Design a protein with these regions (language model features):
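Alpha-helical transmembrane segments in multi-pass membrane proteins
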Residues: 1-6, 17-21, 25, 29, ...
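Generic transmembrane alpha-helix motif of multi-pass integral membrane proteins
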Residues: 2-10, 136-142, 191-197
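Structural signature of hydrophobic alpha-helical transmembrane segments
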Residues: 11-21, 118, 122-132, 176-189
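Hydrophobic alpha-helical bundle architecture
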Residues: 141-151, 164-231
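Cytoplasmic-side transmembrane-helix entry/capping segments in multi-pass membrane proteins
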Residues: 1, 17-23, 38-49, 150-158, ...
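Long hydrophobic alpha-helical segments that form multi-pass transmembrane helix bundles
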Residues: 37-135
């Protein structure tokens, strides 16, 4: 939890907010149930939920710090050291119902964000959520060491893809029109599927349960994105 929590919050989140949220989660989501191995809620997720509801302005994704210098020669175009801008999902929320069928997420300089940008992590967002490539490397390590179950991981992605396809067919809002691939690449979906849903304490333990649990996690994540204006 101590490693995951910094990975799922914006880089400019005040440290005192993280400290308060972490203390709340450890006490009320872990210790009250008996401590390590007995908690029924993921401590890192409870921390993130506490931050979202207690300090929504800092967690909404409307404005986050964005670095404009290149990283190992990738993603250049520096004009200033950094400035704030909306995350792609933040742009979806801001767009509302005005641009149905024509929405295109852009970076802080106004350039369209490509699928390749999402995969490499050249988009604004929390530290651990932007690079799908890095998340996949982490997934390989977890699977190789047998810490996590591939059944849970795959089921989360399948559940998310199926639900996003259903919303695509409905297509009454911008959030519903986001493609399944974009849904899986944007925000914390991939990070959650790999590092959160596979938590050995709070995730399903039966083989059949892993499929059902993962599918429901992925489907619920997309439902919240598409129907909750404050995601």
């Amino acid at each position: 939890s101590g490693i995951l929590i910094p990975m799922i919050v914006p880089v400019d989140t005040p440290l005192w907010m993280i400290a308060v949220a972490t203390a709340f989660a450890v006490v009320f989501a872990k210790e009250v149930f008996g401590g390590t191995g007995y908690n029924v809620f993921n401590v890192a997720l409870v921390t993130r939920a506490f931050l979202f509801f207690a300090y929504p302005a800092a967690m909404s994704g409307d404005q986050v710090f964005v670095r404009t210098a290149d990283t190992f020669g990738i993603g250049g175009g520096q004009v200033v050291d950094g400035f704030s801008g909306a995350t792609p999902l933040g742009q979806v929320a801001i767009a509302g119902k005005e641009l149905i069928g024509s929405f295109q997420a852009v970076d802080v300089l106004g350039h369209p964000i490509s699928t390749w940008d999402m995969f490499l992590g050249l988009i604004p967002g929390s530290i651990g959520e932007t690079s799908v490539l890095a998340i996949l490397i982490g997934a390989v390590i977890l699977l190789f060491t047998k810490i996590a179950s591939w059944k849970t991981m795959v089921s989360v992605f399948v559940g998310g893809a199926v639900m996003s396809l259903i919303f695509n067919m409905i297509g009454t809002t911008v959030a519903m029109c986001v493609s399944p691939l974009d849904h899986l690449f944007l925000g914390g979906f991939a990070f959650g599927a790999v590092f959160m849903a596979t938590d050995p304490v709070t995730s399903a333990r039966t083989e059949t349960g892993k499929y059902i649990y993962g599918f429901l996690v992925g489907a619920m994540a997309i439902i919240i994105r598409a129907l909750n204006p404050g995601y």
